[in-house]
A protein has these predicted regions:
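Glycine-enriched, solvent-exposed interface loops adjoining structured elements
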Residues: 1-192
Length: 192
């Protein structure tokens, strides 16, 4: 019935946003947050909601040959590489690499000698349009402002799956593919 369909609309939107998030690699979805490397501890907690870690760096004020060194980017490696490269976490040194340890932590090697300020660049999903709390709801987000065609098409795919109109789903899938390809092209151009 129509009430059942209407109650599913927030679910359609949530699924559409999740799909776009997985398929779109746009730096506009990135966030920068300060982190701290703790002396003697190779594990650093990530900010809440970090989906993809793009970059990790630390800052020093050390002077080499009279020049102040600033931001030092770490190179990304696999966790297996990190523990093989620095297999004694109690030994310390200047960090060179980071790896994703869990969904909420990164692993730094060598283990930092001293406490260092750092920064992490990561992809975070915007607040969902379907997240209503009491009388307020998010009325716009990155997807509704910048990816409206892809969002609408993805919602129509979910709606037609719900009503089991599988032939129409194929039409919306093709339209969605065109809109997401255009967004990918736009995102690629911003990284030049």
């Amino acid at each position: 019935d129509s009430n059942e369909f209407a109650t599913q609309i927030p679910v359609f939107i949530e699924k559409a946003e999740s799909r776009i998030m997985k398929e779109l690699d746009d730096v506009a979805l990135d966030t920068y947050t300060s982190i701290t490397f703790t002396a003697g501890n190779p594990v650093v907690s990530l900010p809440d909601g970090a989906l993809v870690v793009r970059n990790v760096n630390f800052t020093t004020s050390a002077s080499i040959y009279g020049e102040v060194q600033g931001i030092t980017p770490l190179l990304q490696r696999t966790y297996e590489y990190a523990i093989d490269y620095w297999n004694k976490p109690t030994s310390v040194g200047t960090p060179r690499y980071y790896s994703r340890k869990t969904n909420t932590q990164i692993y730094i090697v060598p283990t930092p000698t001293s406490t260092l300020p750092g920064e992490v660049q990561y992809t975070k999903q915007p607040l969902a349009l379907s997240s209503a709390t009491g009388t307020s709801a998010t009325t716009s987000n990155y997807f509704s402002e910048n990816c409206y065609n892809a969002l609408f098409n993805a919602c129509m795919i979910e709606a037609n799956y719900f009503i089991k109109d599988f032939q129409v789903v194929q039409t919306w899938e093709a339209t969605y593919k065109n809109s997401i390809d255009a967004l990918r092209n736009q995102a690629r151009r911003t990284r030049r």
